[in-house]
Amino acid sequence: TVYDPDTNILINVFKEQFARLNPTHAGEAEQTLKTIRQELDNDDIGRSFYERLSSVSPVRLVDFENPKNNTYHFTAEFTCKRDQDEFRPDITLFVNGLPLVFIEVKKPNNHGGMVAESKRMNQKRFPNKKFRRFLNITQLMIFSNNMEYDTMGGIVPVQGAFYCTTAKQSAPFNCFREENPTNLDIAPYNADFPYKDIDPIVEKKILTDFNCQVIHTSPEYQTNLDTYTPTNRVLTSMCSPERLLFILKYGIAYVRFHKEINGKIEFIEQKHIMRYQQMFAALTVRSKIDEGVNSGVIWHTQGSGKTALSYYLTYVLSDYFSKQNKVAKFYFIVDRLDLLKQASEEFEARGLVVKTASSRAELMEQFRNNQAQEGNTGKPEITVVNIQRFAEDRSKVDLPAYATNLQRVFIIDEAHRGYKPEGSFLANLLDADKNAIKIALTGTPLLKEERESWRVFGNYIHTYYYDKSILDGYTLKIIREDIETQYKERLSEIYEKLETLVEKKDVKKSQIVEHDNYVKELLRYIISDLKRFRQIQGDNTLGGMVICETSEQARKLFAYFDEIQAELNKDASMKSHLRAGLILHDSDDKDTRDKIIDDFKNNMTVDILIVFNMLLTGFDAPRLK
């Protein structure tokens, strides 16, 4: 087979399939190949190529609707080479001649487990600009040592089968667990898959090509042929044509973050791939609508990416309804202003145009507008609504009576908080369009009274519990680390001395934890602990959050922070330059507080956040210790 060594595209296969999928543009195959070569050189994590791959107009590279219209090839040890640098993935999968997937397979119990494989990708392959073309064209990477997931005593699995997509520096390895609601030995998708028998002639040819005919009779080889090994299961789950095309079409997102460096805002782009629970939720929503169900609850635990799921759903459902000649219009409903801001930022980071409504009149105008897109950007849009703003509004919502080809989709966030659907503005809003799709998201189970109030939404569509999220490493276990003995003794000593004053009624108990001596000793511990933790982890971006017992204690911790740090630095061989930020509802104005949170979450210019009585919900800060 003729291939292009610059991109590893199978040229003849690509041209044949291009002509087949685009009969009126058949002569453009060569020019398209040339453009793809140029795009793959871009420093954009493959965005321009992915936009071409996933689009259906003016030409198609892949037929996403009819899997059988595409051709699928695989090869082993296909070298990716540029100048003197090269790497050789174990297996490469091609769709219409395009090398879109590679798979690295290791022996069970390989040295370092899959962590070693992750380091190799993150330290050697992703940062190497010579490999940019090959990584930009690759959409899915799978790594497996053919073992069941095992954390080996840690928190995140280090053995098993993992997947990721391209990155500039490092990509997180994701677990994949096939849907298996009744815990059968083999998940239904794998058990029912129409596998074909292995052709002995093809098998012999492959073994001969790799000069390893001798392994044919070995017990290990026979075990590896088992359809249900961890590697074979993940290949069926992610690389069977229907699933792979779904992931390629809907499972990739480019996310743009900002970061302030030396007073300048810099943008960082990442490429994300759908987590498996998001994929199954999206597939289930689609099949439920097929069955005539137009509402339900998705229970995905905190931290599992519900806003990202909502983003993916906008694409999945837009396509779904366009096949029925309907145009989908999306509303994301929250119950607090800070959540409106957070959701809007998340959607915008992924490229959606966000509309918000600051008054009922404005919302009603958007609601009555029968176009899915109100702007002229051509980008998909979503309207984010803070329902709290309309809490007292109980008047009926009227819509034009005539039928339209518009399909409204409501996604209600944090449904467990009980929006009281009966008789409220939300109820009136949802009732105004009986044909709307209504999806309620919750991160915690609905309690009895909440469940009652949400009966209008029907049953759970999909669930992803916190135990799985912890196993997958998305939700962290909170590890209670005892305070070091020497500090504990000093703090106890101070506490006991002050407690005698409490008994004499000279001070209140709350004042102990606010006392200068207590606060200063606590700061000595916090600063030393974070400094040492960073050294152990070899990561100076790690930050901490202090949740105080009283607001006065928070103020004092902040007030003495620099003084205590300077005192510790006097005798330290390695000095620390930590910066603290204080967040209290009555401290500074809202813009300043937002800036402090942004400096902690994104800009990394605040190292320790001091708060009282609030863990800032949805606090998505991966740098937190």
Residue ranges and their predicted role:
Residues 451-541, 558:
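Interdomain helical connector at the RecA1-RecA2 junction of SF1/SF2 helicase-like NTPases
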Residues 378-392, 602-617:
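Conserved two-lobed SF2 helicase motor
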Residues 401-438:
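SF2 helicase catalytic motif II
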Residues 1-329, 338, 342-353, 378, ...:
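ATP-dependent helicase/translocase motor core
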Residues 350-395:
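Inter-Walker segment of RecA-like/P-loop motor cores
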Residues 297, 329, 344, 351-365, ...:
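Conserved RecA-like helicase motor-core motifs
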Residues 95, 290-294, 376-379, 395-408, ...:
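Short basic/glycine-enriched coil/helix segment immediately N-terminal to the Walker B
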